[in-house]
Amino acid sequence: MEDKQKIISKDYIQKALDERIERIKKYDTRYLQMIKEEALLIDTEGFVVGQVNGLTVIKIGDYSFGKPARITASTYMGKEGIINIEREIEMSGPSHSKGVLILTGYLGEQFAQDMPLSLTANLCFEQLYGGVDGDSASSTEAYAMLSSLSGIPINQSIAVTGSINQKGYIQPIGGVNEKIEGFYQTCKLRGFNGDQGVIIPVQNVRNLHLSDEIIDAVRKNKFHVYAVSTIDEGIEILTGVPAGKKDRNGKFPLGTINYLAHEKLKKFSGITNK
């Protein structure tokens, strides 16, 4: 029977808003279904070299939701520097392109004080068929690069968000709650293993407003939220290997991530610049 009530109450308005959200949420559900069917390739366990789970936010009107995105890096001898594949095919916005250029500055200051930075590296948002903008994935791209250069694999149970500056410090980003929720739902779909979680900028801790379900999972150590302030802190969480800090002679400790990356770049430079 049709409701002929003339006065629109608060309950009617709330019902209409809730139904609108449910209609829009079908896109969120569809992404999870694609991950379940492996139409979207996302790992939530295991270790892989040069591959990191990034976190993105999709907006539809005034509704937004987060989803993970696979980001990969391949590094090899050459002089082309860092190639942003999205930029090459005109799918990268200015903020994302700026983030990649900042990453070049970080690598140069960190590893090229005693030699030219001689490498070619490809960075890619896998299975991206629309545009990408924003610099919130620049830390994720840095971790993928360090993993590729050092040969040390990244823990796929962890997803990452955060931008970086040329000094290697992590900077705050937007949409932190949606991003955490997106990866949490993906891990829930696949099954929790006790290691899964996200790395966020320490500045975004004040912005956290997570669901009771996620808070409960964190309390039970089913899911983790790590807050970091530097690339070195993040890479240690992702690999379990010390990052390594330079001594007074500019040398990294043997066996650390930065030592291995520097040695690879030194090899590239020696061969490329003969």
Residue ranges and their predicted role:
Residues 1-8, 21-24:
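AAA+ ATPase "lid" subdomain C-terminal helix
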